[in-house]
Every structure is written in structure tokens, then in C-alpha cells.
């Protein structure tokens, strides 16, 4: 029975890893925790504050070697038009892991007066990633297993665009635009094409009201498999003294999955911005016909806004920090 559970765990982890972690940084719901830059490079330096963010995510609580992800990111505007940013991440899933560094250059074009929000942005991210497979603890005899830690490094790039007009915001990102030949995994299952396309649309309103609302949708498409996903999101803000309380709810739905499993995710998020600091908690529940574990996914995000400038006349919280 234990061997059957081990095999199921390895196969589940392997399919999850090949399906996502080879595509550099995995895409979850971090962007709803005031961390849009993790998903869209055009958000680098886009607002009136520099932003430092740390996230820690764990899956399948109580399961040994379950997937986990940690990120450290920062970005800020330099001068009037240039944004710079970086991301460090560590992604582990059972015997598989990857560590990466991403650096971003963004250019922001103001289409109206400097104190208004009417801005077009372009960005390019370059990244270096090291993938590894730890075979040293494998207990299943197989002549093709070397029982060492095998690793391989490669490079990739993301391109992004964004447009903001007062409370309206939109992003487009093409991820992993370079084709990479790698020998770490079986070429029958590992494609050169890791491209993924993302579009985010949203609107922030109620700035003068007791509550502010931010509905948004993020759509994803994977070029190689034809998979399509959409996140339907609602975020609510409320200012209390020197703090801003907020909560978000996200529903990720898969469409036309080209023969893959129909997996959907429900994600509630709660957070608070106090002066220049931010903390949030994210819980994700997976739904579908086949589930490895019912424990869900947990994430903590911490943030610090630095070198803040005067806010512009109107804009979403990603443009104008709370304090």
C-alpha cells in the first residue's frame, strides 16, 4: 500500500512539475496581493512607490515533500520613465526543484499631464533558471537511475505591455518566448515551446466611497497544449485610520483543456496595508474529479513600499499606494 501511495505521489508531482515549473515562475494568485509584478513584467516601477515583496507558499499540508514556492521581488521607477525590477524564486516539488533569477527593464510613457494616470508601458524580463532532479533517495531499482542530483541551467525571457487610464488597467504578457533545448527530462514529454500568454483587464472604482471595488479577469493560454484558463476576481478595499483592509476572491476556470484534467481553483485572500507595510494570507482550494489531497494551498505575503512619491490624481492601488 505504501509503494502504491509513493508511486501516485511521484506521478502526481512529476505531472504537476512538467506541466508548470518548467515554465520558470509558476503562476498563482499572487498578483491579487499587491504583487502584479510577479506575473506581469510591465508592472515594474509602474506606481508611485517602490515595492519589496516576499511570499511563501505550501501545498498539501501534512504531505512529505509537497510542492512549495518562495519568492523575493522588488521593483521601482528610476527617473520619469524607466522601471527596474528583479525576482528570486525557489520552487520545489518532491524530487524536482528549480531556482531562478529574473531581471526586468520597463519603460513607461505618460500620455497626459504628469499628475494624471494615462500611461502606456513596455517591459522585457530576462531570466536564468536552474532545474534539478534529486535521484539520490530513489528506492525503486532501475538501471537508468544514477542516484545523484542531476541539474541543468537555461535562459528565457518574458515580454509585457500595460495600459492604465484612471481606474482602468490592462496587461499583456508573453512568457518564455525563447525556445530551449534541455536534456534533463525525456524529450518525448519535454517541449521546446514553453510559451504562455496572459491578459489582465480590470477597473477600480468607488475612490470617494466607504468601500472601493476592483473587479478583474486574467486569461491565460498555453501555446503548445492549447490549454486556456481564466481567473474571475473581485477585490474590496476599506480604509480604517492608518490602515487599509482588503479582501479578494478568485475563481480559476479551465476551458478547452485539450485532453487534460478539468481542474478549477477557488481562492479567498485577506490582507492589510498599514502605512508602508503589507501582509496577506491566501488559501486556495482545488476542485475537480481527481484530487491528490484535500488540504488546500496556503500562502503568506509580506511587503514594504519604499521611496514613495506623491500619488497621482486618480488610479488603481497598483498605481497609487494607500499611504
Protein language model features and the residues they cover:
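Sec/Tat signal peptide C-region and signal peptidase I cleavage site
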Residues: 17-21
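Subset of outer-membrane beta-barrel
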Residues: 22-323
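Bacterial N-terminal signal peptides that target proteins for export
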Residues: 1-7
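Bacterial N-terminal signal peptides
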Residues: 8-16
Amino acid at each position: 500500500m505504501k509503494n502504491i501511495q509513493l508511486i501516485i505521489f511521484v506521478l502526481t508531482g512529476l505531472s504537476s512539475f512538467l506541466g508548470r515549473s518548467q515554465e520558470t515562475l509558476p503562476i498563482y494568485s499572487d498578483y491579487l496581493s499587491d504583487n502584479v509584478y510577479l506575473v506581469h513584467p510591465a508592472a515594474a516601477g509602474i506606481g508611485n512607490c517602490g515595492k519589496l515583496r516576499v511570499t511563501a507558499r505550501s501545498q498539501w499540508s501534512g504531505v512529505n515533500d509537497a510542492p512549495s514556492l518562495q519568492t523575493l521581488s522588488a521593483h521601482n521607477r528610476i527617473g520619469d520613465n524607466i522601471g527596474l525590477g528583479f525576482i528570486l524564486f525557489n520552487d520545489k516539488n518532491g524530487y524536482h526543484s528549480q531556482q531562478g533569477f529574473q531581471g526586468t527593464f520597463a519603460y513607461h510613457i505618460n500620455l497626459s499631464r504628469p499628475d494624471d494616470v494615462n500611461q502606456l508601458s513596455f517591459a522585457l524580463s530576462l531570466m536564468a533558471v536552474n532545474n534539478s532532479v534529486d535521484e539520490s533517495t530513489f528506492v525503486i531499482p532501475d538501471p537508468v537511475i544514477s542516484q545523484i542530483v542531476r541539474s541543468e541551467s537555461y535562459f528565457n525571457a518574458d515580454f509585457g505591455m500595460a495600459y492604465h487610464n484612471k481606474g482602468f488597467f490592462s496587461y499583456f504578457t508573453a512568457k518564455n518566448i525563447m525556445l530551449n533545448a534541455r536534456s534533463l527530462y525525456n524529450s518525448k514529454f519535454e517541449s521546446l515551446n514553453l510559451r504562455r500568454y496572459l491578459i489582465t483587464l480590470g477597473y477600480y472604482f468607488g475612490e470617494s466611497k466607504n468601500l472601493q471595488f476592483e473587479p478583474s479577469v486574467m486569461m491565460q493560454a498555453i501555446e503548445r497544449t492549447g490549454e486556456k484558463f481564466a481567473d474571475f476576481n473581485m477585490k474590496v478595499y476599506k480604509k480604517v485610520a492608518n490602515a487599509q483592509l482588503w479582501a479578494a476572491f478568485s475563481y480559476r476556470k479551465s476551458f478547452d483543456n485539450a485532453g487534460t484534467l478539468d481542474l478549477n481553483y477557488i481562492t479567498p485572500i485577506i490582507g492589510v496595508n498599514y502605512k508602508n507595510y503589507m501582509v496577506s494570507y491566501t488559501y486556495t482550494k482545488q476542485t475537480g474529479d481527481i484530487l491528490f489531497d484535500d488540504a488546500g494551498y496556503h500562502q503568506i505575503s509580506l511587503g514594504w513600499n519604499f521611496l514613495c512619491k506623491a500619488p497621482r490624481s486618480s488610479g488603481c492601488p497598483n498605481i497609487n499606494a494607500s499611504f
